[in-house]
Amino acid sequence: MPKLIALISKKSSISEEDFKIYYERNHAPLIESLFPTLNGYTRTYLFESNLLSDTLPLESDGAQSQFNVITELTFKNEEDLNKFFERGTSQDVIEAIRKDEAKLLAGEKTIMYRID
């Protein structure tokens, strides 16, 4: 099953709570509506309040991650993944995503990986 992960940063002007609320109520439904070949779309939030570096024996300086959410996108097969990428080249899709992301994301920091 093909998978992509995106490491995403919020705008510094948005609180963690407001970011999560907006992402769940607006951004995630938008992405799901634009990309019908998604088989799964999960988010894991990396907020400072959840940081455990002080309680675990890690070699870490305890600094907050530059990312605020890890998004995982899964697809049933390669064909669905390819349809996702094809759909992502549509000007309407690009504009809808950029308009929404401008409200909450520091888009220049987003990194995406294929992880299967």
Label every PLM stretch briefly.
Residues 1-116:
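Macromolecular interaction modules
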